Amino acid sequence: MTKVLYITAHPHDDTQSYSMAVGKAFIETYKQVHPDHEVIHLDLYKEYIPEIDVDVFSGWGKLRSGKSFEELSDEEKAKVGRMNELCEQFISADKYVFVTPMWNFSFPPVLKAYIDAVAVAGKTFKYTEQGPVGLLTDKKALHIQARGGFYSEGPAAEMEMGHRYLSVIMQFFGVPSFEGLFVEGHAAVPEKAEEIKANAIARAKDLAHTF
């Protein structure tokens, strides 16, 4: 069975967020088109997503030195264990849908913490004599991102770092197909905000048939 990991990184729901509204339209249509696929919603603002900190480094160091997982402290086990769970869940999925806003030219920090949890050598990529090689070569990914301004082209395109970062990390993981669906300009042209949102929702529903 095809497994889709629907990853949202926004504190608001679809009634307050443009990206979440478009994401909801996409995933609901996707479920209708693919009723036999398993869709798992991972809300990064509601789930426990550990950050790499002193406990994580300490736990990793102990494991590398040959100690067992049970020999870690309670804090180390909780954090390292959860990161392992997130990584295994990520690897087990066939498709990824990331839904984020653009905040200060990037995305919310909780998504970076999540990426740090799943970027594991030997799991999502490996090191070789020729350099790192991605291991997720049979996956595909989509990024739905809301941007208040216009960043798809022109000088401002160089300032957008959220989608570009995800593109780089997906390539690093070996994911061969990575698409972007952008809702942009609603803050720059507020009188057209509803039209911009409606057009993005329509595109999302269309994309759900082919993703």
UniProtKB/Swiss-Prot annotation:
It holds the Pfam family Flavodoxin_2. Binds 1 FMN per subunit. It catalyses: 2 a quinone + NADH + H(+) = 2 a 1,4-benzosemiquinone + NAD(+); N,N-dimethyl-1,4-phenylenediamine + anthranilate + 2 NAD(+) = 2-(4-dimethylaminophenyl)diazenylbenzoate + 2 NADH + 2 H(+). Its EC number is 1.6.5.-, 1.7.1.17. Disulfide bonds: none annotated. Keywords: Flavoprotein, FMN, NAD, Oxidoreductase. FMN binds at residues 17-19, 102-105. GO terms for molecular function: electron transfer activity; FMN binding; oxidoreductase activity, acting on NAD(P)H as acceptor; oxidoreductase activity, acting on NAD(P)H, quinone or similar compound as acceptor. Its cofactor is FMN. InterPro entries: Flavodoxin_fold, Flavoprotein-like_sf, FMN-dep_NADH:Q_OxRdtase_AzoR1, NADH:quinone_OxRdtase_FMN_depd. It comes from the Bacteria. Signal peptide: none annotated. Belongs to the azoreductase type 1 family. Quinone reductase that provides resistance to thiol-specific stress caused by electrophilic quinones. PANTHER family: FMN-DEPENDENT NADH-AZOREDUCTASE 1, FMN-DEPENDENT NADH:QUINONE OXIDOREDUCTASE. Homodimer. This is FMN-dependent NADH:quinone oxidoreductase.
